[in-house]
Amino acid sequence: GPGVSLMQEFIGLAYFAEIPAVLFDVQRGSPSTGMPTKTQQADLLSAAYASHGDTKHPLLFPEDPTECFEMGALAFDLADRLQTPVFVMLELDTGMQDWLTAPFRWDDARALDRGKVMGAEELEAGRDFGRYLDVDGDGIPYRTLPGTHPRRGAFFTRGTSKDRYARYTEEGPAYVDNMQRLLRKFETAKSL
């Protein structure tokens, strides 16, 4: 609901800095405080294009608590794989009512999809690491996780324009390159 409106700037930061995030949006009648006890699909455009500028976000639409559970797990995989915010869009009835369901089953052997993560071995071998470098042409760069390597793979991320190596720049070609890469990422998301 209105909480998505209040989070727009931070959603844009997560999108542009490519920080995985999952947001569950229980929609109600809007605008403003609207009708807080009535269901409505009022946040679709707000979530799809959350923040200013050229942002797009994957949206998942569960219809019952079981799908909420399943799509919740999928949302975390997609957020990591695409390195972007993912929304799980619920209607008020689904999110706020009491439901009788079969027990949810979690498979402890299920592998998490962390996406493109560069390990210490690759860094040690001298593989070129640029936090926003699109090696595979799908718009999704490789990332490292904190503590991967004592001297390589660290990066400083920001919400401002940057080049492929996460260095601040306002040069037009670097900005255009980054925005085109982000659009390729969204095209990749359509095929997942």
Regions found by a protein language model. Name each.
Residues 1-49, 58-79:
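Thiamine diphosphate
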Residues 17-23, 46-51, 156, 164-173:
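A broad, low-specificity signal for short, low-complexity segments enriched in glycine/proline
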Residues 30-32, 45-52, 115-117, 121-123, ...:
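Ligand-binding clefts of soluble mixed alpha/beta catalytic domains
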Residues 71-192:
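Flexible, low-complexity linker and terminal segments
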